[in-house]
């Protein structure tokens, strides 16, 4: 009976194991997870902190016991894989509760260890990061136990923005600082202005080009010379791949510690796959490498690897489009395609439209800003971005499908919109992009 070992039990690992079991009722499947929880919704965590998700149990899909009862898959939490011997096909495992170590053999090994939150490195009792349900519980318990009011949020990526919004919704008083003036880097810089407008509108303090120099109790000294007091600090300063345990193996890592994979999510070592945040692949629509550490990619990779292991070696990954979205108070920011800083590798043109998300005479209308970049050599779409209070998700998802099928910007005129006054225009913003590009 083949033995399949999975490292990591969150989106990629648990999903892959589940999909393998759906296709293969016989193999012995075991998952090692170094932390407390398995199969939780990472994307729900800011909303648990904000009490928008009222019961944290909604963010937890399975316990190891429930997973075994449903799928006959063994999950061992607090078990950390600390080394791989790919020649003997074994992994070394540390039981973090007992400190005991043991070896486990495998026929197939699936690596989905995810990434860990970066830390600013200050020794402080009031600093927290947010990466898993344990972090969420620690933040929530600290807020309740210490009657927290003033919270400093460090960083301005999508997680920090979601955390800040949810702290505000909970009734706390957050302040945002960021070390540069470049916020929400997946979005075009000039399209991020509504973020600052929303902060101003709600009188939420923020400072760009600001950093922490020192923390002394609740007293924070900043690079600017300011000294302020906060009850709590939440750091959202990026992540790094959990690949340290891989370094002693023959598995190839790139300079940042990620694992390059082929279109079957195979590593350079036979019988070893990598999925989720740790894996790097390529874009679907252009010839560039891509790392997209978001939920869709982990789930798609999990399905492909499961099919491969079950014997369907014809299924392959066609690449990322990098579709992403974030809500910040009343606005939605969404984009798809290459990142803004990757556009310089192409000879491109940009076309944009700003108009109501639906018919102007229908109540509740608000402006939607839609922008498309296309390659001048073949007129295929490289990137699209949308910002507005309504309809950004719909337009970006439609453009994602267009890019998936390599449509040109001119063909957007042929997009047949589902039109009624509450939803769109007879000529949608997507159509107008096509007309303006001609």
Curated annotation (Swiss-Prot):
Instruction: Identify the domain of life.
Output: Bacteria
What EC class is this? oxidoreductase
Q: What is the effect of changing residue 43 to S?
A: Loss of activity
Function description: Catalyzes specifically the NADPH-dependent reduction of coenzyme A disulfide. Is also active with other disulfide substrates containing at least one 4'-phosphopantethienyl moiety such as 4,4'-diphosphopantethine, but is not able to reduce oxidized glutathione, cystine, pantethine, or H(2)O(2).
**Gene3D superfamilies linked to this entry:** 3.30.390.30, FAD/NAD(P)-binding domain (3.50.50.60)
Q: Where does NADP(+) bind?
A: 151-166
Q: What's the encoding gene here?
A: cdr
Documented EC number(s):
1.8.1.14
Additional observations: Reduction of disulfides occurs by a thiol-disulfide exchange reaction, but involves only a single catalytic cysteine residue that forms a stable mixed disulfide with CoA during catalysis.
The residues the record assigns to binding substrate are 15, 19, 22, 39, 42, 71, 299, 427
**Catalysed reaction(s)?**
NADP(+) + 2 CoA = CoA-disulfide + NADPH + H(+)
Pfam families for the chain: Pyr_redox_2, Pyr_redox_dim
Write out the residues that bind FAD.
Answer: 8-33, 267-277, 419
Active-site residues per Swiss-Prot or TrEMBL entry:
43 (nucleophile), 43 (redox-active)
The record's InterPro entries line, in alphabetical order, gives: CoA_disulphide_reductase, CoA_disulphide_reductase_staph, FAD-bd_OxRdtase, FAD/NAD-bd_sf, FAD/NAD-binding_dom, FAD/NAD-linked_Rdtase_dimer_sf, Pyr_nucl-diS_OxRdtase_dimer
Q: Which family does it belong to?
A: Belongs to the class-III pyridine nucleotide-disulfide oxidoreductase family.
Species source reads Staphylococcus aureus (strain NCTC 8325 / PS 47)
Q: State how it assembles.
A: Homodimer.
- The protein here is known as Coenzyme A disulfide reductase
Q: Could you confirm whether the keyword Flavoprotein appears in this record?
A: yes
As for pH, the annotation reads:
Optimum pH is 7.0-8.0.
Keywords tagged on the record: FAD, Flavoprotein, NADP, Oxidoreductase, Redox-active center
Q: State how the cofactor is bound.
A: Binds 1 FAD per subunit.
User: What does the record give as cofactor?
Assistant: FAD
Q: Which GO terms describe its molecular function?
A: CoA-disulfide reductase (NADPH) activity; flavin adenine dinucleotide binding; NADP binding; protein disulfide isomerase activity
């Amino acid at each position: 009976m083949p033995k399949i070992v999975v490292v990591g039990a969150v989106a990629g690992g648990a999903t892959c194991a589940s999909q393998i079991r759906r296709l293969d009722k016989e193999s012995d499947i075991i998952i090692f997870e170094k932390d407390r929880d398995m199969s939780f919704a990472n994307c729900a965590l800011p909303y648990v902190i904000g009490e928008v998700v009222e019961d944290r149990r909604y963010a937890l899909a399975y316990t190891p016991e429930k997973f075994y009862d449903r799928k006959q898959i063994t999950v061992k939490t607090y078990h950390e894989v600390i080394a791989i011997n790919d020649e003997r096909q074994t992994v070394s495992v540390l039981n973090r509760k007992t400190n005991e170590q043991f070896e486990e053999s495998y026929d197939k090994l699936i690596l989905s260890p995810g990434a860990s939150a970066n830390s600013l490195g200050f020794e402080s009792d009031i600093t927290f990061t947010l990466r898993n349900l344990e972090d969420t519980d620690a933040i929530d318990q600290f807020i309740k136990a210490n009657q927290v009011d003033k919270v400093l949020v460090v960083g301005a990526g999508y997680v920090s923005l979601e955390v800040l919004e949810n702290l505000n919704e909970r009734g706390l008083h957050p302040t945002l600082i960021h070390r540069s003036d470049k916020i929400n880097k997946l979005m075009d810089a000039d399209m991020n202005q509504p973020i600052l407008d929303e902060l101003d509108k709600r009188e939420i303090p923020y400072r760009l080009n600001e950093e922490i120099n020192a923390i002394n109790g609740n007293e924070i000294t900043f690079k600017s010379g300011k000294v302020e007091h906060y009850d709590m600090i939440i750091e959202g300063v990026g992540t790094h791949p959990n690949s340290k345990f891989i370094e002693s193996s023959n598995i190839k890592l790139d300079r940042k510690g990620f694992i390059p994979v082929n279109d079957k999510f195979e590593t350079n070592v036979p019988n070893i796959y990598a999925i989720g945040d740790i894996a790097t692949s390529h874009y679907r629509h252009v010839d560039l490498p891509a790392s997209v550490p978001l939920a869709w990619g982990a789930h798609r990779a999990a399905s492909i690897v499961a099919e491969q292991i079950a014997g369907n070696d014809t299924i392959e990954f066609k690449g990322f489009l990098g579709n992403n979205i974030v809500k910040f108070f009343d606005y939605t920011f969404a984009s798809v395609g290459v990142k803004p800083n990757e556009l310089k590798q192409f000879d491109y043109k940009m076309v944009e439209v700003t108009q109501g998300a639906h018919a102007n005479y229908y109540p509740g209308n608000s402006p939607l800003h839609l922008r498309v970049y296309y390659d001048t050599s073949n007129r295929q779409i490289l990137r699209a971005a949308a910002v507005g209070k309504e309809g950004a998700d719909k337009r970006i998802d439609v453009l994602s499908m267009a890019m998936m099928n390599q449509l040109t910007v001119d063909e957007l005129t042929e997009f047949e919109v589902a039109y009624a006054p509450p939803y769109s225009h007879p000529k949608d913003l997507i159509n107008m992009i096509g007309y303006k590009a001609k």
